[in-house]
């Protein structure tokens, strides 16, 4: 990209003069011809003035996952790194707090927050008393008070079912994880499983025997659940599975490969996330690409709307995803 120095050389004026003209310094007295030459040089060199963003202070990033949960699912680690990178790009002075720190560790002078993870009712009440400005990524735990940005998992689930049925699959299973409700400590059904059940029921295709779910979204969980499906169903194994997330899908592929079950000729697999190694597993994974950069960028922008522009209307933003077709589905 062209610099002030480049424009000064092109136009034949000093760097100081060029800088003051391009920054509309009203105290500078130069002929109109000089200004015109500088503007022409800037246009010729495709110069774009850098936007100086005001510093936004006292922002908290609540990363409410354990180290084990992050290790099991690279999706969240990628999200954390992206939020921290974008905070710098948008000139946001942000401090990261982890679940081990506890909600009480967040200081009273906090102006706003971005949050990832699962929060209890008590923690949400604490945040409501702390600030009006907050954005959750990947969940909507308090839509009456705080913004959220999340991938449209329900739509991805319906699209998966539609694609598989269009390809002639009549028996479709689901393998996924569950979440622990922080208020009850009980396992709860994920939105992907909820949508799969309701949509398959609408199509009169739901078969409870084909659904295998257990807490966690790890490779190990996927391996264990697909192994259980193979052992339980035998020759009645469905011809396709929707998998809730790529780490689970990797474990499922391992189990199928170990048993010599052909993918995709015998069982097709479709997953969600498109994590970095999805294209390197055997066979390469057909999966929805969730744009984590876009999720996080929208979260930062929504927070700045609240903090800087004083917006009070609560927003919930769903982000779509592109299906990346590889060799695990036919």
UniProtKB/Swiss-Prot annotation:
HTH lacI-type domain ranges (all copies):
2-57
SUPFAM superfamilies per UniProt:
lambda repressor-like DNA-binding domains, Periplasmic binding protein-like I
For this protein, the record's InterPro entries field holds: HTH_LacI, LacI/GalR-like_sensor, Lambda_DNA-bd_dom_sf, Peripla_BP_I
**Record key words, sorted:** DNA-binding, Repressor, Transcription, Transcription regulation
One term of GO molecular function: transcription cis-regulatory region binding
In the record, biological process GO terms are:
regulation of DNA-templated transcription
For whether the record's keyword set contains Transcription regulation, the answer is yes
Record-linked Pfam families: LacI (PF00356), Peripla_BP_3 (PF13377)
Q: Does the keyword Transcription regulation apply?
A: yes
Q: DNA-binding region located at which positions? A: 4-23
- Write down the superkingdom of origin: Bacteria
Q: What does this protein do?
A: Negatively regulates the expression of the ganSPQAB operon. Inhibits transcription of the operon by binding to an operator in the promoter region. In the presence of galactobiose, GanR dissociates from the promoter, resulting in the expression of the gan operon.
What name has this protein been given in UniProt? HTH-type transcriptional regulator GanR
Which organism does this record belong to? Bacillus subtilis (strain 168)
Q: What does the record give as the organism's lineage?
A: Bacteria, Bacillati, Bacillota, Bacilli, Bacillales
């Amino acid at each position: 990209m062209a610099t002030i120095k480049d424009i000064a050389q092109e136009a034949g004026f000093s760097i100081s003069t060029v800088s003051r003209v391009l920054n509309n310094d009203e105290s500078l007295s130069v002929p109109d011809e000089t200004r015109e030459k500088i503007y022409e040089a800037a246009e010729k060199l495709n110069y774009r003035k850098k936007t100086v963003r005001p510093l936004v202070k006292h922002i908290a990033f609540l990363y409410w996952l354990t180290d084990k949960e992050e290790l099991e699912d690279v999706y969240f680690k990628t999200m954390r790194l992206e939020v921290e990178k974008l905070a710098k790009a948008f000139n946001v002075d942000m401090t990261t707090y982890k679940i081990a720190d506890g909600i009480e560790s967040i200081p009273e002078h906090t102006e706003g927050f971005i949050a990832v993870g699962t929060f209890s009712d008590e923690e949400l009440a604490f945040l409501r008393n702390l600030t009006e400005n907050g954005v959750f990524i990947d969940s909507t735990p308090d839509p009456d008070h705080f913004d959220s940005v999340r991938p449209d998992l329900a739509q991805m689930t319906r699209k998966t079912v539609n694609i598989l049925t269009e390809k002639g699959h009549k028996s479709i299973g689901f393998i996924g994880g569950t979440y622990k409700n922080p208020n009850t400590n009980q396992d709860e059904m994920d939105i992907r499983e909820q949508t799969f059940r309701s949509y398959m029921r609408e199509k009169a295709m739901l078969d409870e025997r084909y659904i295998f779910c257990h807490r966690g979204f790890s490779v190990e969980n996927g391996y264990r659940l697909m192994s259980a499906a193979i052992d339980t169903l035998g020759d009645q194994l469905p011809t396709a599975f929707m998998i809730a997330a790529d780490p689970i899908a990797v474990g499922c592929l391992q189990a199928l490969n170990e048993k010599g079950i052909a993918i995709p000729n015998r069982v097709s697999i479709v997953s969600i996330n498109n994590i970095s190694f999805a294209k390197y597993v055997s066979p390469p994974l057909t999966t929805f690409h969730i744009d984590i950069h876009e999720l996080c960028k929208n979260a930062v922008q929504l927070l700045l709307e609240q903090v800087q522009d004083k917006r009070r209307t609560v927003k919930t933003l769903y982000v779509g995803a592109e299906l990346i077709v590889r060799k695990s589905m036919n």
